[in-house]
Amino acid sequence: MWDPDVYLNFADHRGRPFFDLLARVGADRPHRVVDLGCGPGNLTEVLGRRWPDAQVQGWDSSPEMVAAARGRGVDARLGDIADWVPEPDTDVVIANAALQWVPEHRDLLVRWAGQLEPGSWIAFQVAGNFDAPSHAAIREVARREPFTAALADMPWRDADVVGAPVEYAGLLTDAGCTVDAWETTYVHELVGETPVLDWITGTALTQVRQRLSDDAWERYRQAIIPLLAQAYPVRSDGRTFFSFRRVFVVAQVT
């Protein structure tokens, strides 16, 4: 279960890639803008302010996130990204930090490029950090007792779950798009006693939390804290630097 409040604890940090992505979308007066994986809707609102004459719609598979987005006045729909089909007047498709959770997203991108009208835009960014120390720590603790039984069938994601910019550029160019693709590694400055754990609790650890009892979850937290502290040490000034690689693609259908 995705918790909108936990996710929004780092809203400023999580929002920066969205703005970097949006800055490269050249749509002028779109009719319909769809935010796939809209989450709590705080960034979907930004789309409405940029394109006030467009019909802006959110789409998310989490009932909690959809409820939070609707609470902000967003036209949010509940559904899996894999099931989404663009309506004929869709001009802009945004997927911010969502497609890495969709195994077949490469096929979806090609399909959308074929369904959207010429001139339409597909813009997405995906987390490219599944080989980062934070994810290695998540998997290492999951292999320990007493967590192995509950987490034995976890769908762990490897580094190749997302492609390099050049892969997406080739994929969407072959699908008939003009493509701008790049990657950025952000160094987030975090504060607090367990800032990286607090960050991943809102994203990468959501499925782990679902599978563990309250007691087991607290034991898991205590087990992963020293691993994260070693990988992301707190500086003498109380700051922790958390590196996070992201891959960006902006494609216009031709």
Curated annotation (Swiss-Prot):
Record InterPro entries: SAM-dependent_MTases_sf (IPR029063), Trans-aconitate_MeTrfase (IPR023506), Trans_acon_MeTrfase_C (IPR023149)
Keyword Kinase: no
GO molecular function list: trans-aconitate 2-methyltransferase activity
CDD domains noted in UniProt: AdoMet_MTases (cd02440)
Biological processes annotated in GO: methylation
The UniProt record lists the keyword S-adenosyl-L-methionine: yes
Protein localization: Cytoplasm
Coiled-coil features, chain-numbered ranges: none
Keywords recorded for this protein, A-Z: Cytoplasm, Methyltransferase, S-adenosyl-L-methionine, Transferase
Catalytic activity: trans-aconitate + S-adenosyl-L-methionine = (E)-3-(methoxycarbonyl)pent-2-enedioate + S-adenosyl-L-homocysteine
GO cellular component: cytoplasm
SUPFAM superfamilies the record matches: S-adenosyl-L-methionine-dependent methyltransferases
Top EC group: transferase
EC number from the UniProt entry: 2.1.1.144
Pfam families, alphabetized: Methyltransf_23
Major subcellular site: cytoplasm
Function: Catalyzes the S-adenosylmethionine monomethyl esterification of trans-aconitate.
Record-stated family: Belongs to the methyltransferase superfamily. Tam family.
Protein name, per record: Trans-aconitate 2-methyltransferase
Source species: Mycolicibacterium vanbaalenii (strain DSM 7251 / JCM 13017 / BCRC 16820 / KCTC 9966 / NRRL B-24157 / PYR-1)
